[in-house]
């Protein structure tokens, strides 16, 4: 009798079936128009913030990414949370002692928008080492959504990746690996303040192009060659090909810098800190081989 009552069901998240109608050109045009309405200011560090520095944003963004990864959040949660954070910082001066509270609140709201089972206030407070209380986070949530005028359905680079892949004549197994690497690049870009000036569609296109280049897929498929893929993606998002190439090079340079810092931290943590302070911005002449990246 005891064995008959044993429940062996696995709790799985229910997902909708893919809808090809959501990937047509009309939807893409609407998305390209909508992304302009949710763009943060590129100069808020100079014009709005008195205490917050780019290095502080980098620290809190890295912490937010680690929380999202540990909680296995949907890929869209972290970039959406960073969109909220940048837009809020574009409008309201924030004390540096409140930056982590703002970051936690942005994750809290973004997870409600994208997760089936969102992050709880109590869990996020634990990740701050209980430096904030749940009631503080809930109050900050009201401040955040009111400041953003409840415009919370912002476009993120992830929204565009599927549109690009659906239009590319590429084998499904290659699409899967391009998607995975592009999603990783998008998260990496969200931690770097230099990419605030790039619209989500360009970050997505640059990430897809960088993934295809780094995986050397162009040798087997002429469509994925450097110039041909860049021209194709620039037409899709209606931008100058040179601007897209510059964005792609920035992504490759950021990846190379991140890999170099990670390797140095394993060897000499002190030397890695010194190099991070220098903030070198050298563009990679050749794409980083992303096959060496453990994603």
Curated annotation (Swiss-Prot):
The keyword tRNA processing does not apply. Residues 264-295 are annotated as: Disordered. The modification Phosphothreonine is found at residue 286. Keywords: Cell cycle, Cell division, Cyclin, Cytoplasm, Isopeptide bond, Membrane, Nucleus, Phosphoprotein, Repressor, Transcription, Transcription regulation, Ubl conjugation. There is a cross-link at residue 270 (Glycyl lysine isopeptide (Lys-Gly) (interchain with G-Cter in ubiquitin)). Residues 28-152 form the Cyclin N-terminal domain. One of its GO terms (biological process) is G1/S transition of mitotic cell cycle. Residues 273-282 have a biased composition (Acidic residues). The keyword Nucleotide-binding does not apply. It comes from the Eukaryota. GO terms for molecular function: cyclin-dependent protein serine/threonine kinase regulator activity; protein serine/threonine kinase activator activity; transcription corepressor activity. Phosphorylation at Thr-286 by MAP kinases is required for ubiquitination and degradation by the DCX(AMBRA1) complex. It also plays an essential role for recognition by the FBXO31 component of SCF (SKP1-cullin-F-box) protein ligase complex following DNA damage. Ubiquitinated at Lys-270 by the DCX(AMBRA1) complex during the transition from G1 to S cell phase, leading to its degradation: ubiquitination is dependent on Thr-286 phosphorylation. The DCX(AMBRA1) complex represents the major regulator of CCND1 stability during the G1/S transition. Also ubiquitinated by the SCF(FBXO4) and Cul7-RING(FBXW8) ubiquitin-protein ligase complexes. Following DNA damage it is ubiquitinated by the SCF(FBXO31) protein ligase complex. SCF(FBXO31) ubiquitination is dependent on Thr-286 phosphorylation. GO terms for cellular component: cyclin-dependent protein kinase holoenzyme complex; cytoplasm; microtubule organizing center; nuclear membrane; nucleus; transcription repressor complex. It is found in: Nucleus; Cytoplasm; Nucleus membrane. Belongs to the cyclin family. Cyclin D subfamily. Interacts with either CDK4 or CDK6 protein kinase to form a serine/threonine kinase holoenzyme complex. The cyclin subunit imparts substrate specificity to the complex. Component of the ternary complex CCND1/CDK4/CDKN1B required for nuclear translocation and modulation of CDK4-mediated kinase activity. Interacts directly with CDKN1B. Can form similar complexes with either CDKN1A or CDKN2A. Interacts with UHRF2; the interaction ubiquitinates CCND1 and appears to occur independently of phosphorylation. Interacts with USP2. Regulatory component of the cyclin D1-CDK4 (DC) complex that phosphorylates and inhibits members of the retinoblastoma (RB) protein family including RB1 and regulates the cell-cycle during G(1)/S transition. Phosphorylation of RB1 allows dissociation of the transcription factor E2F from the RB/E2F complex and the subsequent transcription of E2F target genes which are responsible for the progression through the G(1) phase. Hypophosphorylates RB1 in early G(1) phase. Cyclin D-CDK4 complexes are major integrators of various mitogenenic and antimitogenic signals. This is G1/S-specific cyclin-D1.
